[in-house]
């Protein structure tokens, strides 16, 4: 049998998967156990008005009946430093010790920003990647459990967040210490998504899978994950868009979203860069 020879690459690859993932219809029921596992006793739930209005937030809160829960539901469509600081004030007032993000990429990214400022000194910008701040984000960052309610960004398994800071810049914050300690991926939470949002977030997942696969770094596990995710999204995005109650399509789109972000560590491309410009 002929062997395929590995070609040398100029950059060393990091191959690391950290997040414990609960993935299934009804997985939201594991929320209390995951909180206990990661040491969260007084959680703050970070969400947005749309998730709250759709009743999805209440589904999460029902799992935590009897827990001392604080809620921050003012996440803007694009997370801002102002919103992060408002959430910090509520986090401190509630004597919280961890975070649960229930929503799409915006809520999860805001929670990651909050995980920094709630436990680290100085302004948020100090920890931005472009400012050399990634090494300053320590393991003391507040523990985070991510509960995605859309199938697109994959933020629940990603180590980065994008936040608009006070001077108007859109900055990235990246650290393995920002990885959610758990991701609860319950496709049931996405069945009520409008078709336009299903299509838009689904295309995000497709773009992630394509770009990560084509990135030049050597990371065979990421290649396999990205290709499988692309196949799932390619065959199910139209079905999920046409019929939001199609459970098989919803499950496969949530998987594709997660897989695209799991492969982020291999690298992305121009489309992703332009979307953050």
Predicted regions and their residues:
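Glycine/threonine-rich beta-strand-loop-alpha-helix active-site module
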Residues: 82-188
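N-terminal small/polar loop signature for handling phosphorylated ligands or for N-terminal nucleophile
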Residues: 52-123, 238-250
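An N-terminal, well-structured beta->alpha segment
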Residues: 1-72
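C-terminal catalytic subdomain
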Residues: 268-277
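A short N-terminal beta->alpha junction/helix N-cap motif
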Residues: 19-23, 47-52, 75-78, 194-197, ...
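Carboxylate- and glycine-rich phosphate/diphosphate-binding segment that chelates Mg2+/Mn2+
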Residues: 159-264
